[in-house]
């Protein structure tokens, strides 16, 4: 702005008419500055740059005669001063704006308390120079958007050259000042910032500074990957161990369950003598593994055949007479005969050696097993004859063949057609009662079979122990005989 004013001053100094007009303007500016001296002062740089010092020619024209010449010169001058000043300032406006912003930023950075400036304030600062003379300076108003310098017509110009704004009698021309923006609380203030539109900020030393966060330490990715791989390997080992434990426990449970099923179905004891000894009370290993000699193998063969014959006899009993239990008299007679034979054998076997005694016992066992099956059949026939008649025979006396068919559990369709509904209902009820009784009898027989199997296992173990003991005694006796 100083450059533009210097250029305007130089142009007017060259023309005497313009210089006279400038003297007239200077008198008016002095009057305007005296009227606005009560307002806030501006920077000393602008006031000093805009001071007007009259030249020698102007001093000579300050006389009364010179004032008349000034009026006549102004009347003869074609172009008024405001129009000329408008042209010059519009030409140098961009340069003035840049210089003014730099000066304001420098001044705001130097001052701690940045005063707010609002549009419409008259800034005048009295410079304290060496001569002590007071000189007031007024800044030029900001250009309007339409390019006009002054917001009012040239008619508002008075004789002293000042612009009087309507509604503001005490105000001078409005200077162009940046508006201070309000800063939100908590924001950090620093040095000057030109991009903020002339915003005055406190220096870094005056405000609170937010501490910067320290940088994160570097990560060792290789060690982290190794650690993760080790954790995954440990988890896999734990899973494998848990799976092996579950598999072992499930295998044990399956074995136990299979043994229980075999015991419940009754087929566990029908597989041979080895299983008899494996489930014996003493808990010794299987008989087939323990027996070494051919004599013991023969005993196993005999026992196996006996078990087969017993099973055949049981099957024949269940097929023929499931509804009739064994007679207690037959059991007692068989037990008495067994006792008599065992007593006689014990008396006769005392005088024999071990081998001959073993052969004789094996022969007797074979004979008993061979006679067991026909004797069982004869016992079943006797029980059938002693069986009670069906109650249906008493209800149907005129149909004896139906009672016989009921005994045989077989009826023809022609017989059923000849019977009434009541007679058929009686037959159905009788069949239900027989089914219940047969089921109860079957349960009792199964319990007896289990007991007999356990007794058989115990006998086989006893026989094995006795055989081993007898063999050891026989060897001991044989060793003593040559020594004598």
From Swiss-Prot:
Keyword Transferase among record annotations: no
Segments of skewed composition (Polar residues): 239-252, 321-332
One Gene Ontology biological process: roof of mouth development
Entry annotated with the keyword Nucleus: no
GO molecular function: protein homodimerization activity
Chain intervals with Basic and acidic residues compositional bias: 1-28, 107-120, 150-159, 306-320
Keywords: Coiled coil
Coiled coil spans: 421-455
Ranges annotated as biased composition (Low complexity): 33-67, 123-137
Annotated region described as Disordered, given as residue ranges: 1-74, 86-220, 232-258, 305-350
InterPro entries attached to this UniProt entry: SCHIP_1, SCHIP_1_C
Regions of compositional bias (Acidic residues) in chain numbering: 92-106, 341-350
Quaternary structure and partners: Homooligomer (via coiled coil domain). Interacts with NF2; the interaction is direct. Interacts with ANK3.
Name under which the protein is recorded: Schwannomin-interacting protein 1
Designated gene of the protein: Schip1
């Amino acid at each position: 702005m100083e450059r533009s004013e210097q250029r305007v001053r130089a142009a007017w100094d060259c023309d005497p008419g313009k210089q006279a007009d400038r003297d007239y303007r200077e008198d008016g500016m002095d009057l305007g500055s005296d009227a606005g001296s009560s307002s806030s002062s501006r920077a000393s740089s602008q006031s000093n740059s805009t001071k007007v010092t009259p030249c020698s020619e102007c001093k000579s024209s300050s006389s009364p005669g010179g004032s008349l010449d000034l009026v006549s010169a102004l009347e003869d001058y074609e172009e008024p001063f405001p129009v000329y000043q408008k042209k010059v300032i519009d030409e140098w406006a961009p340069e003035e704006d840049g210089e003014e912003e730099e000066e304001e930023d420098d001044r705001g950075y130097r001052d701690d308390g940045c005063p707010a400036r609002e549009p419409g304030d008259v800034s005048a600062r009295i410079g304290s120079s060496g001569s002590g003379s007071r000189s007031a300076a007024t800044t030029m108003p900001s250009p309007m958007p339409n390019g006009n310098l002054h917001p009012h017509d040239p008619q508002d110009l008075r004789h002293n050259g000042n612009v009087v704004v309507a509604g503001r009698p005490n105000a001078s021309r409005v200077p162009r000042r940046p508006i201070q923006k309000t800063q939100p609380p908590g924001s950090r203030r620093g040095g000057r910032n030109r991009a903020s539109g002339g915003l005055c900020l406190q220096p870094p030393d005056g405000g609170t500074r937010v501490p910067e966060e320290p940088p994160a330490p570097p990560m060792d990715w290789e060690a982290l990957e190794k650690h993760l791989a080790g954790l995954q390997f440990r988890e896999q080992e734990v899973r494998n161990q848990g799976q092996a434990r579950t598999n072992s426990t499930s295998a044990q449970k399956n074995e136990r369950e299979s043994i229980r099923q075999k015991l419940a179905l009754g087929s566990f004891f029908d597989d041979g003598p080895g299983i008899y000894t494996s489930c014996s009370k003493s808990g010794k290993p299987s008989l087939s593994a323990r027996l070494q000699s051919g004599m013991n193998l023969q005993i196993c063969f005999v026992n196996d055949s006996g078990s087969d014959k017993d099973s055949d006899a049981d099957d024949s009993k269940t097929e023929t007479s499931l509804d009739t239990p064994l007679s207690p008299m037959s059991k007692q007679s068989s037990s008495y005969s067994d006792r008599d034979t065992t007593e006689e054998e014990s008396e006769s076997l005392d005088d024999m050696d071990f081998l001959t005694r073993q052969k004789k016992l094996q022969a007797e066992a074979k004979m008993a097993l061979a006679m067991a099956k026909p004797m069982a059949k004869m016992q079943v026939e006797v029980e059938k004859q002693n069986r009670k008649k069906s109650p249906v025979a008493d209800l149907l006396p005129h149909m004896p063949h139906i009672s016989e068919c009921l005994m045989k559990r077989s009826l023809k369709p022609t017989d059923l057609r000849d019977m009434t509904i009541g007679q058929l209902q009686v037959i159905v009820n009788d069949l239900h009662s027989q089914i219940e009784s047969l089921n109860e009898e079957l349960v009792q027989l199964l319990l007896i079979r289990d007991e007999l199997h356990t007794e058989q296992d115990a006998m086989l173990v006893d026989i094995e122990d006795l055989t081993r003991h007898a063999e050891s005694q026989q060897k001991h006796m044989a060793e003593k005989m040559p020594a004598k």
